[in-house]
Every structure is written in structure tokens, then in C-alpha cells.
Amino acid sequence: MWLKPEEVLLKNALKLWLMERSNEYFVLQRRRGYGEEGGGGLTGLLVGTLDSVLDSTAKVAPFRILHQTPDSQVYLSIACGANREEITKHWDWLEQNIMKTLSVFDSNEDITNFVQGKIRGLIAEEGKQSFAKEDDPEKFREALLKFEKSFGLPEQEKLVTYYSCSYWRGRVPCQGWLYLSTNFLSFYSFLLGSEIKLIISWDAISKLEKTSTVILTESIHVCSQGENHYFSMFLHINETYLLMEQLANYAIKRLFDKETFDNDPVLDDPLQITKRGLEYRAHSEQFKAFFRLPKEETLKEVHECFLWVPFSHFSSHGKMCISENYICFASQDGNLCSVIIPLREVLAIDKTDDSNRSVIISIKGKTAFRFSELKDFEQLVAKLRLKCRAASTQDDVSTEVAVSSDSTGPSENFEEQPLTCPKECSKTVNTEALMTVFHPQNLENLDSKMLKEKMKEQSWNILFSECGRGVSMFRTKKTRDLVVRGIPETLRGELWMLFSGAVNDMATNPGYYAEVVEQSLGTSNLATEEIERDLRRSLPEHPAFQSDTGISALRRVLTAYAYRNPKIGYCQAMNILTSVLLLYAKEEEAFWLLVAVCERMLPDYFNRRIIGALVDQAVFEELIRDHLPQLTDHMTDMTFFSSVSLSWFLTLFISVLPIESAVNVVDCFFYDGIKAILQLGLAILDYNLDKLLTCKDDAEAVTALNRFFDNVINKDSPLPSNVQQGSNISNEKSDHTKVDITDLIKESNEKYGSIRYEDIHSMRCRNRLYVIQTLEETTKQNVLRVVSQDVKMSLQELDELYVIFKKELFISCYWYLSCPGLKHHDPSLPYLEQYQIDCQQFRVLYHLLSPWAHSANRDSLALWTFRLLDENSDCLINFKEFSSAIDIMYNGSFTDKLKLLFKLHIPPAYTEVMSKTSSKGDELSTEELLYFSQLQVSKPADEKETESGRNSPEKGKGKIDIQAYLSQWQDELLKKEETIKDLPRMNQSQFIQFSKTLYNLFHEDPEEESLYQAIAIVTNLLLRMEEVGRKLHSPASSASTARDSGPSEGNAESSVKKDLPSPREEHQWSFAFEQILASLLNEPALVRFFERPLDLKAKLENAKSSQLRSRTKM
């Protein structure tokens, strides 16, 4: 390919390159060692190693062409090639098209300029063609073949992209290729005969970060299952890192965090994920977050342009971003100017006749925006006019909007149980903010605080006259300055709606709230019970929430939201936040503000595991380490900051600050998002730094911070003294220094305003991996603690078994959209019920781990074991059930193992298994396995009732049934007390299958012959005992019974079939477990076989290394 001309010193180059062809102006060279017999000897080997380590282009392109001029030692590299054919093509083109022209130039300088210009033109032409494709299909196809050949992953594994880089093995960099696929990060290197192959699943990564050290200038650090991996020498390290970050977060959300995993068309199907799709999604998410747009919006186009700012009389340079329903602009010249134009507000789009390629967008309210220097502005104007027509048609047609798709009716949590609504449960929606109702402004008696409030209002009115008012107002640095000073009481609700983007949600969903209120009131479920419990705990000191008006409004908003979003339902702290929203916003506005906070501004905060809040706590700790290192040196345990700051994040400081100060924090939050909360948290710690450094323990530090919060005041607050929380305290504690909230917020902006949104987003992504993996580790430790009490395995063996169990669940879900394991995964369930496997997954694990997996009927054994363990017949088993079977196989006594085998051959475990494909022998297809695993054994009615009660009390996700828990616990205790006398008898067909299984288990055993003889003796002994028993119980029929003849000890299995009675007499034949046990104990060979110690540790190690391989083979 053609290269951008760069200087090369030929004197040094000749040591590593050999000349192939040359003429007056060009030289064709070949890299030493390439294309030579024996690889060019030692020199070729060293050059090849150097290329690999330094990631030289020569490693993949060992040919190049240089442009030379006479009497000069400086040459220009202009082309390179992967093979002789490619470079010869370039050489021929130069001779045919360039050489003839060069003779007309007089000076060497003109020749060089001409060649450089020609080559740059060729590169630009190639760039235009390849940009449309983004990736070279030929190269990608070649990389895909290498990926499949090197790692042998299933063909469904989708390669997203690949990069050349170095992997550090100790202190040695190994040059190779990094492949990023949907489920794995893979690296391959082959250097000097040494092969390195690394496969890391995204779901196993707990840390992913860019690092810099003395040796590694820039590298990507990956931590997986306690092992650290470093990759460096990337051509585009930022692009690589962002893509890795997206893939890791996608896997984590999909597999661990189904609760918050949104269906996304870009990520819905793991087989359709592409590099371009991921980049598009990342830009779209960033766009929505920056402009606070509804989550349904997607970024369609981006255009560089200038926007005329009328009040400043200059054009601001920035980017115009267009989505389905919005035109947005953000400056890039440091003016902090941004504009959001909803298409529903647009009246006309015109283009000017001047040469500036300008577009004028006129909106309602007699405002116009002028965008200039737009490329392809003719096409852009046509597209925008089309969008505006579509938007206006939509507005005309739909005046009523149904419940949106993400809240289709009540969830399974909502049982439609009519309630006798109390008096306060009125459906009348408040049309005024509670502050307006309970604290109307007295315009006649204006005190100093009210005068300041009026001055604030005047400042905002001046801003509105300059920048406009409403959704499409200009947002500038002046806007932020006014927000920091505190929004006036009368404008607070309006501006919260504006800055949060809730105004757009409400405008596009008219009538939605009233409909949801109507549908949700009168329902009863766990969420509504929790809401009722917390209603009177929400700002109890405020008069608005001491009356039915405020309480009813709060109930309606919270219940409506729980109905809209059953994934979240209701979470503690939502009541405190909503009560403050209701003070300043109308009821419907408060609902949409809550939607904006829970679903966009604080994602994943208000779910069962408050993952979002935990992630932001980790981000806060990271910022403390960066900005307040002396505090982290003093406070060795960083968990203190986590415990203290949780309420700060969940309630936006409302729970720790007096209400009159907290609302100023909420002002900043709606304008700046989580950045404002993090900055304020740092400012508070910085303000109290000296006190915190003298604290000896956590309790002392908490007391110091609480005392500080008690003395935060808002001296300009116009709220009456009976409402202000700070005023009462300030009288009692006058000896402590008062801190004004406005000064504190200003200080937080001055000191920590340099923290960027992009950095916070990156820290959130990075810490999300760590937080979720920590939660998963907690789940694992709790499961192991419970299970370890019932098994003989060591904790280490149990730990490894759990990892394999969970890994198999994930591997089987990697390439499928609907996996039963993921479908039933619910982090809110008890730890043991969170991860469960189906019969197909159990079969794979049985083949990997069972000491009986060598048996010819291993699929049948796996099926019967699964049916035995699946006591509640939901076709899923948890880790406790799984580990109990493995423990018996490896650590059980002779009696335990025999009892397990006996149970496998009687109902409910046993079922007749016939494979449809006789050629496969006993092997069962996935469909057959699924069919047989779901077969139900008929049981008495009373037993069915008992079985149905064995399901987890929380599986319905409704109210937790304590009685069901006690019943389940009692069942487990009874199960432990089960004796061998409680086991039912085994009939003829079951006994034949039991005998066959024993024969299969003994196959290829060192004592195979003696085991066969022993089982033949036992079988015949049992038959004779049963014959005698029959004669004793049925003397009349004894004459018709054939006399026993001793079987030959050669073929015992044929003797079993010969001596057993005909099927019509089957009901008369059966064996008790005690009979079988007593007979087997008489044969030492059988006892030795079942009591032989088995190496579980080695089996686990082998399973871990071959788990993925076994999946690809099956």
C-alpha cells in the first residue's frame, strides 16, 4: 500500500534491508530474513524478533519502495507490501506513470515535491474508498480465519475487531494479535518457536484500565480471576480501550445484571454485534446524556458548523447533532454554549442566499437560530424539513399516548386486588406545587430575604430576555453561575423540568400520568406496602406532608412510578427525593422528574442492589485519592467514605442537609448531573480536612461530619422559619462556625470544576466491573458457607466447583438470546437460587466431573441424576443440589454411593430412555434430553401439593412467605433423617437397568473380570432369594414355578435375562435396597471398587482447562 512519505536514513537502513531493484529515482528493498532459505540464518532470526517486539510494519510488510534523489543520503519511504506481487504492482505503476514525467523537471527539489504530491493524492483517493467500508473486508476475513484457527471457539463466536499489540509475559513483551470478540478477549503470538495463546472471557474481568509505568509508557491492564495481564504498543490505544470497555460492560450487564439490562437493538443479539455498532451506540449514549434527551432518541448525524449567538454578537464554533426528534448544538471553542431544539417547536427551516451555507431554523415564540458553514447543507435542509413534517403530523394524529413499551401494564408483582381506598386516596391530581399551596408569597411585606429573592428572579428574567426561555434557550456559563447562586423559589420547578430534560418526556407523553395513576391506584403488592410504610417518613417536619394533600400526592407519584417501572418498583430514598420534587413542581411534573432521575440521571441507583450508587461511591473514592491524598493516607480503610457517602448519593444530600440548603444542591444536580454531587462531596471533605485528620476512628469522623451538616445554612432562603431545619439548630449551636451552602457550592466549582463528564463516565464504566464482581464474590462466599455444612469437600474444592458450575451456565448463554439460566437469574432471590442450570448444562458438567462419566449409558445416568436432584420439577437445579451429587460420587461411603445408584433407577429419577437415533447408541440429542427431563411421574394428589410447596418462597417475587420457608426447612431436615428402610422397592425392569449400569461402570477397570464375576454372583443370589420369598408367600403357585438352576459365571447379564420372570408376573418381583446392599457387601471386589479413593482435585483442574473445549466439540 502507499505510505505517507517519511524520511529514511539509508546508511542505517542497509543493515536491515536488502536491495532488490533500483533506478535513478526509486529503490525496491526486501527485509533481511524474509524469503531466504533457513530464514536468513541468525541475522534473519534477530531481525524477525526485533520486528515482532517493536511492532514494526516490516513484520507484516517485508517489502518497501523508497524515493531517492541523486547526491542525497536522505530517502523517502512511499510504499510497502506484504508480498512480492503487491510491491511489484506498485513498482510497475511508478515506472509507467511517474518515471517518464520526472525527466522534465530541472531541480531535485521539484522532483521530490511532485512525487510527494502524487503519493499523497493516491492515499487520499484510497482513503475515500475505504472510509465507506470502515474495515477492509479482505483483511477482516483473513483475521477471522486466523482467529478461528488459533482458538477453536464455536463458529457462533462473533469477532468484533483485532489489533496488533504486545503482551507482557513477566518482563518480556511478546508481539502478537489481540482479538476482541463478543464474549472473549483473546491474544495469540508465535515468536521464535514459542506460542502464546490467551483467552479471557469478558465476564471474568474485574479490572480494566489504562496505565503508565516507567517501562510501559501506555498500556491496558486487565485483571481476571486474580491474574494481571498487560497489553501495550497499540497504534490506537484509546480506540482499543473504549471498545474493550464497552464489550466488558455489555457482558457484565447481560450475564450478571439482567435487572438493568435494557433491550437495545444494537446489543440485542450477541451474534450481530459489530465494531461500528458499538461505536455508534457509544456516541449515541454520550449525546443523550449530554443533552438530557429521552432514552428512545438515537444520534443520526453530526455536522461541524457555527451558531450565531445574538446576545454576544459572535458565531460559536461547535457541532450540530441531529436525532429523530431533536436538533442540538454544543460549542467546542470554550464558550460553554449549548442549544436543544425539539422538532415539535420548529415552524420553518430556511436557507440563505449568501456564500456562508447558512440554515435558519425558526421556532415558536418568535425565535430563530442561524447555523452557518455547513457541509452538504442543501441535503441537510431537505432532511430537516422532512423530519419537521413527520414531527408535526405525529403531533396532530396522537393527542393521547398509551402506556409506553417499557411499562406495558402491571408487572407480575402487581396483583389486581381492589382496595377500599381511604379518603386520602383521591385520584385528583394536584395542579399546583405544594410550596405554592402551603407557603404563598406575601408581596406586601417584603423582608430582606424576599428582596434578595426578587433580585434573583430579576437576574433570571434578564437572562431569559437575552437567551430565550423554555427548552430552546441558550445555555451558557452565565446560566451555570445563576444556578450556583440558587434558583428562585418561583422558577425552581420550571427550571428543574428544563435542565433535567423531563419537560421533553412530558411533552411527548400527554395524558400518560393520569392514565397510569388511574391504573395503579387500588393495586396491592410489595411495592405499595413499602410505599404506605414510608409515606409519613418523608419530610415529616414539613406542613405539606402533615396533611392529606401532600401525602396523597406522594402516594400517587410513587405508586404510578412503581407501576410504570416494575424492574425498580419502589426503593427507599425515592420517597425523600419525590417529596422535595413535589414541593416545587406540579404533581405530573414531579412524576416526570422522578422518571428522569431514576432512568437517566442516576441509572441503576434505585434497584434492589443499588448498583449505580455503589459504582458512584467507588468513583468518589477514586476522586478522593486523586484530589485529597493526605486524607487517604490518614484513613487507611476507604470503606468509611463508602458508608458515609451512600446517603449523599441516594438522596442528593437531602437526608443530611437542612431542606432550605438541600434544594440548592438539587438545583446544581439537575444542571450538572452527578458531577455536581461528586464535586460537593469533595468540597465538604476538603472543608473538614483538618478535623478529619485528627480523628482516631470512624465514629469520631462521622460525628465531625454530622456536626458540619448541622451548621450548613442558607442565609438567603425565603422559607418561613417553621419550615427551615437549619434555623432551629443554629440557635442552639451558635458556638460552631456557620457555612453558607452557596459559598460551599461555589468553592466546589472553583476547586473541582475541572473534573470532566468524560472522566466520570470512564470511571463509572471502570468501577462498574469491580462493583459487580465484588457483589458476585459475596454471593459465592454466602453460597459456599451454606453448602459447606452439608458436604465433605474442602472449601477450595467447593470454590473451584462453584466456578466451573457458574462458568458452564455462562458458556451456554454466550451464543443464545434466550437462555433458561439467564431468564431465571434474579439477584433479589436467596443466594442459592440466583444461579441454576438446566438439564443440558448439567449433562456437560456430568461428562466433565462425574467419575461415572466413562459409562456407556452416561447420558441416561446424567438425565436420571438431574431428575433426582430436581425435586420441585422446575427443570432447574441449584449449586447446593449439584454439589451434593458430586460429593456423594467422590466422598460418599459405599452405602451412600450405592443408595445414589439405587435412587437413579427408581422413580421419580428413572424413566425409560430410548434414543431416536440408534447409530448414536445411548447418546441423547438436546431435544431428547429436554423431553425426558420434563417427563412427570404420576403421584398421589396430596404428594403433588407437597411438591408444589417446595418451590422457593420468593420465586413469585411477591410477598415473602415465612411459613413457606419454615416448611421448606422442615422438609430438608426430614430428608437428612431419611433411612434406607424408607426407600421404595425396585421392580424387574428397573433392576435389569441397574445391573446394566453396574456392568458399564466396571468396563476397563483393572479388576474388570473379578467385578463381572462378583456382580453375576450377586445377581443370581438376589434372584434365588426372591424365588424363595415367592414360594413362602405363594405356596399354591410354587408348583408352576420353574426350578432354579445355577447360572454359569461366564455371562452374568444373559443369566439375569434368562432367569427373570415374564413381564406379566413383573408385579410379583421386586428388591429392597437392604437386599441389594447386603448382597454387594459379600463381594470384596465390589466393595473395593466403590470405596476406592478418587482424586477430585485433579478432575476439577482438568474440567477447568477443558470446559470451553468440551463445549466446542459437542
Swiss-Prot record:
Site (Arginine finger) residue list: 533
CDD domains: PH-GRAM1_TBC1D8B (cd13350), PH-GRAM2_TBC1D8B (cd13352)
Every GRAM domain range: 145-212, 285-353
Listed SMART domains: GRAM, TBC
GO CC, alphabetical: cytosol
Keyword Electron transport on entry: no
Region of interest (Disordered), ranges: 399-420, 938-957, 1032-1061
Intracellular or extracellular location(s): Cytoplasm, Cytosol
Gene Ontology BP, a term: glomerular filtration
Residue ranges, compositional bias (Polar residues): 399-411
Sequence ranges assigned to domain Rab-GAP TBC in this UniProt record: 486-673
Biased composition (Basic and acidic residues): 940-957
Listed GO MF terms: calcium ion binding; GTPase activator activity
Sites annotated Glutamine finger: 572
EF-hand domain location: 857-892
Keyword list, A-Z: Cytoplasm, GTPase activation, Repeat
Comment field on protein domains: The arginine and glutamine fingers are critical for the GTPase-activating mechanism, they pull out Rab's 'switch 2' glutamine and insert in Rab's active site.
Role: Involved in vesicular recycling, probably as a RAB11B GTPase-activating protein.
Complex formation: Interacts (via domain Rab-GAP TBC) with RAB11B (in GTP-bound form).
Protein name: TBC1 domain family member 8B
Native organism: Mus musculus
